[in-house]
């Protein structure tokens, strides 16, 4: 299931599983999976996206965008479903399965897909002006020069109230 780790941590864990399969320490492939309840796979205004305060926590963009991105980056399967433990109607979940068979191809896929899977959700939250997400995506861009995320420009509430 899920791990509360950043992209780097998840990639290292997945690499360890893939290497264990390659070396024979594990006798069969490993499937990494996520159904919901994570940084990027769920739009749920009562749980996963409850820390998005710009009104967009009720949209399904993150789950949909995420499974499309995961599929392009090597997921073995992706899924879109509703519910996720908080009921039907206002929640959409995007999940994936990723087969780690010990191959170099699996290593390439795990790096591409897990990097996207985590940072897509962090980016989405940063665009909604979540302070922790802005911090996290800036940190990730500092580690990886290929990652370019447009950062939000915050406006003082008093300025908005004055003009609107």
Language model regions located:
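Conserved internal helical-beta-strand scaffold that buttresses enzyme catalytic cores
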Residues: 1-164
